[in-house]
From Swiss-Prot:
Subcellular location: Cytoplasm
GO BP: any one term: carbohydrate catabolic process
Active-site residues annotated for this sequence: 91, 153, 183
InterPro entries tied to this protein: Aldolase_TIM, DeoC, DeoC/FbaB/LacD_aldolase, DeoC_typeI
Role, per record: Catalyzes a reversible aldol reaction between acetaldehyde and D-glyceraldehyde 3-phosphate to generate 2-deoxy-D-ribose 5-phosphate.
Pathway of action: Carbohydrate degradation; 2-deoxy-D-ribose 1-phosphate degradation; D-glyceraldehyde 3-phosphate and acetaldehyde from 2-deoxy-alpha-D-ribose 1-phosphate: step 2/2
Species assigned in the record: Mycoplasmopsis synoviae (strain 53) (Mycoplasma synoviae)
Record's protein name: Deoxyribose-phosphate aldolase
One term of GO molecular function: deoxyribose-phosphate aldolase activity
Name of encoding gene: deoC
Superkingdom of the organism of origin: Bacteria
Family listed: Belongs to the DeoC/FbaB aldolase family. DeoC type 1 subfamily.
Keyword terms of this UniProt record: Cytoplasm, Lyase, Schiff base
Catalytic activity, as annotated: 2-deoxy-D-ribose 5-phosphate = D-glyceraldehyde 3-phosphate + acetaldehyde
């Protein structure tokens, strides 16, 4: 299977420079990845670069990243600006602590506010599975199903672990045949990992070492 069009090619390090972002864009372009995923500060720059390449490469921007602890209005405004600057998709982080304290209404409204701010653009919801129990992952999936978002996403890549096969299986057990896709991200180090997660229900992947993984090279992760 060709995974290239299922990949959001990612560079989210705080020390990112134009050189890093230029490299990300060129790899995305040359390997026909679905999108490049960047922090919102880079969206306008990336949009200009992609336009010059006359490419269909999409732009994903992260919001409330990586902690999810920004107030709702800040998340919504950041998402709105990212879309105005050229983002096609938004990956936002939930208010993880509010989920854990069972303030489910806050978590749902937080997501809905961002969705309202971006209209018909695709919204992916990062629940940071590393910080959740299996039951909390199930509850988060139920909330995202009600929110109008298009995707649920495992991880930021900034916690103590990234996506696991078990995370994907747990999410899919709640989603079943309902209209919500799964993005697996963070710590994916082999093509075999991707294949197993895809079989379990993941339809998008967030990778920073996309090129190496598709060459079937095992890559080092920080986990």
């Amino acid at each position: 299977m060709n995974f290239n069009q299922l990949i959001d090619h990612t560079y989210l390090k705080p020390e990112a420079t134009k050189k890093n972002i230029d490299n990300l864009i060129m790899q995305g372009f040359e390997h026909n990845f679905f999108s490049v995923c960047v922090n919102s500060i880079w969206v306008k720059y990336v949009k200009e670069k992609i336009k010059k390449l006359n490419s269909n490469l999409k732009i994903t921007a992260v919001v409330g990243f990586p902690l999810g602890a920004s107030i709702t209005q800040a998340k919504a405004h950041e998402a709105k600006l990212a879309v105005e600057h050229g983002a096609d998709e938004i990956d936002m982080v939930i208010a993880v602590g509010f989920l854990k304290q069972k303030d489910y209404e806050y978590v749902l409204n937080d997501i809905k506010s961002v969705k309202k701010a971006i209209g018909n653009k695709v919204l992916k919801i990062i629940i940071e599975t590393a910080l959740l129990t299996k039951e909390e992952i199930k509850k988060a999936t139920e909330i995202v199903l009600k929110s109008g978002a298009e995707f649920i996403k495992t991880s930021t890549g900034f916690s103590y672990r990234g996506a696991s096969l078990d995370d994907v299986v747990t999410m899919k057990s709640v989603i079943k045949d309902q209209k919500l896709e799964i993005k697996a991200a963070g710590g994916i180090s082999t093509l075999e990992d991707m294949q197993k997660m895809h079989e379990a229900g993941a339809t998008r992947f967030g990778l920073s070492k996309s090129v190496e993984i598709l060459k079937n090279q095992k890559v080092e992760t920080k986990y």
